[in-house]
C-alpha cells in the first residue's frame, strides 16, 4: 500500500487531480462551521490522521456537462489513525457542503484501509423512493489493482449517482439509485428477520406458537422473493 493515494491510482483521469502541495486540508477548516458536539469534535481529531483533496470532478476539467444541481464532486482522502471511522462528522460535513451550495457540491470520501480503500458518500433522503432519511454509505474494501473508481454518466448529476451506486450497491449504474438502495436495505432487514423467525420457530414447543411463527416466516419469505425478483428485474433494465 503506497504512503499516499493519488487520483490516478484510484482510476480517475489525471486532469481531475489536485496537486499534492495544494491538496492538504487542515482538520480545523474541515469541521469549522459544523454544529457538532465537543465529543464528536474530539473523536474527529483523535481518529483522523490527515485529510487531502485528491481530485475535483467538474465540467471544466472533464468536459462532462453540469447536472441539474451537481456542479462539482470533491474527492477527499480520509486517512485514519486506527480502524474507527468518525462517520457522524463526515456525514455532517458532506451534508453541510450539500446544503450550503444548494446541492451543487458533493463529496466522495476515499478511506485507505491498509490493503486498498473504501469509499463513502452522503445520500439525501428520498421519501418517494423509500429513503426516509439521509445518511452516509460506506463501500466494501476495494483493491488498488482493480478497475478503481469509474466516472459514468452523461452529466455530473449522473456521475454523482453512479459514484453513489458504486459505493452503496457495488455497481456503476446511475439509474434509480435511491429505489435500488431502498430495496437492498429492505432485503437485508427481512433476511435478518427471517433468520430470527427460523431460530424462534426451531425453539418453540407449543403448536400454536409454532404455527404463528411459521405464518410469519411465510409472509417474510414471500416479500423477500418479491423484492429479490424486483432487484434482479431492475438490474436487467439498468444493465
Where are these regions (language model features)?
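Short, charged, amphipathic alpha-helical segments
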Residues: 207-218
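Peripheral peptide segments
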Residues: 129-130, 182, 232-235
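Short, charge/polar-rich alpha-helical segments
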Residues: 170-187
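Extended assembly-interface/linker segments at domain junctions
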Residues: 86-172
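Non-transmembrane amphipathic alpha-helical segments
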Residues: 183, 187-204, 220, 224-227
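N-terminal, leucine/charged-rich tether regions that mediate assembly and partner docking
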Residues: 1-112
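Amphipathic alpha-helical coiled-coil segments
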Residues: 219-239
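N-terminal/domain-start segments enriched in small and hydrophobic, helix-friendly residues
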Residues: 1-7, 11, 18-19, 25, ...
Amino acid at each position: 500500500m503506497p504512503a499516499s493515494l493519488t487520483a490516478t491510482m484510484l482510476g480517475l483521469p489525471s486532469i481531475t487531480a489536485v496537486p499534492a502541495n495544494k491538496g492538504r486540508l487542515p482538520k480545523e477548516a474541515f469541521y469549522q462551521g459544523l454544529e457538532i458536539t465537543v465529543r464528536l469534535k474530539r473523536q474527529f481529531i483523535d481518529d483522523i490522521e490527515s485529510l487531502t483533496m485528491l481530485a475535483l470532478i467538474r465540467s471544466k476539467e472533464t468536459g462532462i456537462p453540469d447536472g441539474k444541481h451537481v456542479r462539482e464532486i470533491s474527492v477527499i482522502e480520509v486517512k485514519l489513525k486506527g480502524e474507527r471511522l468518525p462517520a457522524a462528522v463526515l456525514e455532517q460535513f458532506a451534508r453541510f457542503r450539500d446544503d450550503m451550495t444548494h446541492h451543487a457540491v458533493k463529496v466522495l470520501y476515499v478511506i485507505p484501509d491498509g490493503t486498498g480503500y473504501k469509499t463513502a458518500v452522503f445520500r439525501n433522503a428520498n421519501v418517494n423512493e423509500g429513503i426516509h432519511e439521509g445518511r452516509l454509505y460506506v463501500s466494501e474494501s476495494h483493491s488498488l489493482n482493480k478497475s478503481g473508481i469509474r466516472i459514468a454518466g452523461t452529466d455530473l448529476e449522473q456521475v454523482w449517482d453512479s459514484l453513489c451506486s458504486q459505493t452503496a450497491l457495488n455497481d456503476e449504474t446511475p439509474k434509480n439509485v435511491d429505489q435500488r438502495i431502498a430495496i437492498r436495505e429492505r432485503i437485508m432487514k427481512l433476511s435478518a428477520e427471517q433468520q430470527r423467525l427460523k431460530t424462534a420457530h426451531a425453539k418453540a414447543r407449543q403448536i400454536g406458537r409454532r404455527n404463528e411463527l411459521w405464518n410469519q416466516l411465510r409472509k417474510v419469505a414471500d416479500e423477500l422473493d418479491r423484492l429479490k425478483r424486483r432487484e434482479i428485474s431492475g438490474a436487467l433494465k439498468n444493465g
